């Protein structure tokens, strides 16, 4: 309905262009919003206020001209000028009946639109180092990225979902040496575990697999491992110690042996990540290996693009990118003095490759600690001839778990932390997906474990699912009385839905397409969460106030058409969130 009103306004402005208006304004000048007060109609627009200056007219005078130029429409009961120049629209009763019919006709497709025009969007999310199980922070990124991709798809964008596997570099070496030290312990060697190593029980499981796969072939005496190593923390530096330990491991078991430890560790951890996400209902279209990407020549290609454009220079033996010329706070090294390419070089090459794969918009879902990342990568994209605005990076704030009033400790390298799998096991996938999205992604989230498990109306996901199940129960009661639902009769009799509860239900129900577009444009899945809570509240109020299975067949079928419409919209919304819509609870 909102889009149709905007089209009516555009038609009116087209009629006025060249006379009342000097020229046709851009389409984005026309904005229609729902009113907060029903006394002001159903929708309102400030288009006259926005265009008055360019038209050199009083806003109220211009608003009157626009209203007079509006085409006839069965959608509208009337349009009128209000206040300083607002245009208020009151919809005809049949407008809501027609929208209710659209819910029944379009069913699972209701709420979908062509807003995105098929624009290709790549959403990269989670992309956690495969150095341990996913933790609850990764879970929030997964829920946000998956839901955003679903919403963008519903809004008419062509979306691909990608996971970038950080399978190269120092963190993988630390995982491998952590597993090897635990393997040596299993073999009977006594040696301290590195302060900077990964400490979870999963590392002991990796050690068991190493023993099964290699027997004693990788065993080396603890004395040989520790000889000449610098002091570890707290007396020494944990970073220097772990690097020296990695070098010693390569020396003692050889590059091939260390590579075998790394490959087994990577395969197991990446397999665990894939399985965890699949169980969470999160899917990816593409899994890109950092190691394979680095070996593909893509970084050299990106550096060549920068070189040809004159944006690289040499200083102190290193190759630098002139990032400050493109809005970054300082220039960036792309190739170190030793010839090693930097992570930054890999990052900008990866984003150039995304663009060259045909994606118009790149959305990187990142952790809150990546706040300085976007400006750097955007500078690189601009320097390589790409539009800087093609890159977006929603930063996902941290998650804190609470059990009662006690905050649950978390941290990947500590012995105690909460994995996504553990959280899902305790509260279930539905509560996980929903609770992660209850607040805007840019706000910290306190996850209430006890509330998430509660089977009461205080639990918002339960409350929404209960609305869906209640409608299913109504239909079972209908069948038990030997009655059936006549959809055509119900829609034809929609004018009988005239109680205050029914009008509130119709108004809430028909907002759904607008909410999906709003959530897509603002990259805000939480807007859908809030809407579903409001819709469920209106429904439960209606359910408690009215009888649906009444003697009058027209009224009965009209009410059933309404509540089945609610069920459909709730199901559509929950599906986008990755939450189930049960028939009974």
What are these regions (language model features)?
Residues 98-103:
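Short, charged, solvent-exposed linker or helix-capping segments at domain edges/interfaces
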Residues 1-97, 108-585:
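Non-catalytic interaction-recognition regions
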């Amino acid at each position: 309905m909102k889009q149709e009103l905007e089209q009516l306004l555009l038609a009116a402005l087209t009629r006025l262009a060249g006379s009342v208006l000097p020229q046709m304004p851009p389409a984005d000048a026309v904005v229609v919003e729902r009113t907060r007060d029903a006394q002001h109609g159903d929708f309102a627009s400030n288009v006259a206020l926005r265009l008055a200056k360019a038209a050199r007219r009083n806003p109220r005078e211009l608003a009157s001209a626009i209203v007079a130029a509006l085409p006839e429409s069965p959608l509208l009961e009337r349009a009128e000028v209000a206040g300083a120049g607002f245009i208020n629209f009151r919809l005809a009763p049949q407008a809501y009946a027609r929208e209710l019919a659209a819910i029944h006709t379009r069913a699972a497709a209701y709420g979908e639109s062509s807003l995105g025009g098929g624009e290709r969007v790549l959403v990269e999310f989670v992309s956690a180092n495969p150095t341990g199980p996913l933790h609850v922070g990764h879970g929030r990124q997964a829920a946000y990225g998956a839901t955003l991709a679903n919403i963008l798809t519903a809004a008419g964008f062509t979306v691909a979902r990608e996971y970038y596997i950080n399978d190269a570099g120092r963190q993988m070496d630390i995982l491998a040496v952590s597993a090897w030290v635990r393997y040596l312990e299993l073999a009977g060697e006594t040696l301290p575990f590195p302060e900077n190593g990964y400490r979870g029980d999963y590392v002991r499981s990796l050690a068991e697999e190493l023993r099964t796969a290699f027997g004693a072939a990788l065993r080396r005496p603890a004395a040989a491992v520790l000889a000449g190593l610098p002091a570890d923390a707290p007396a020494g530096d944990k970073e220097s110690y772990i690097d020296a330990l990695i070098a010693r491991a390569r020396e003692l078991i050889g590059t091939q042996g260390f590579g075998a430890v790394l490959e087994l560790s990577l395969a197991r951890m990446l397999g665990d990540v894939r399985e965890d996400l699949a169980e969470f209902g999160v899917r990816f279209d593409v899994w890109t290996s950092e190691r394979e990407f680095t070996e593909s020549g893509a970084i050299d290609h990106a550096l060549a693009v920068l070189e040809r454009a004159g944006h690289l220079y040499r200083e102190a033996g290193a190759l630098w990118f002139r990032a400050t010329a493109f809005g970054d706070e300082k220039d960036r090294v792309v190739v170190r003095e030793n010839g090693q390419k930097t992570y930054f070089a890999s990052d900008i090459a990866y984003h150039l490759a995304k663009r060259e794969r045909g994606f118009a918009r790149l959305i990187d879902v990142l952790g809150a600690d990546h706040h300085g990342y976007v400006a750097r990568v955007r500078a690189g994209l601009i320097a390589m001839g790409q539009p800087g605005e093609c890159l977006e990076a929603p930063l996902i704030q941290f998650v804190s778990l609470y059990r009662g009033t006690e905050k649950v400790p978390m941290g990947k390298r500590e012995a105690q932390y909460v994995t996504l799998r553990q959280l899902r096991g305790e509260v279930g996938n539905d509560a996980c997906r929903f609770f992660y999205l209850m607040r805007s992604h840019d706000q910290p989230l306190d996850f209430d474990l006890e509330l998430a498990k509660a089977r009461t109306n205080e639990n918002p996901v339960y409350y929404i699912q209960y609305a869906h199940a209640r409608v299913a129960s109504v239909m079972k009661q209908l069948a038990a009385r030997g009655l059936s639902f006549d959809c055509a009769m119900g829609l034809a009799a929609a004018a009988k839905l005239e109680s205050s509860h029914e009008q509130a239900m119709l108004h809430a129900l028909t907002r759904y397409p607008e909410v999906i577009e709003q959530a897509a444009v603002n990259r805000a899945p939480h807007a859908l969460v809030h809407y579903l809570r409001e819709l469920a509240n209106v429904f439960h109020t209606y359910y408690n106030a009215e009888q649906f299975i009444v003697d009058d067949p027209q009224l009965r079928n009209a009410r059933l058409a309404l509540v089945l419409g609610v069920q459909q919209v709730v199901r559509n919304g929950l599906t986008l969130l990755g939450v189930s819509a049960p028939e009974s609870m």
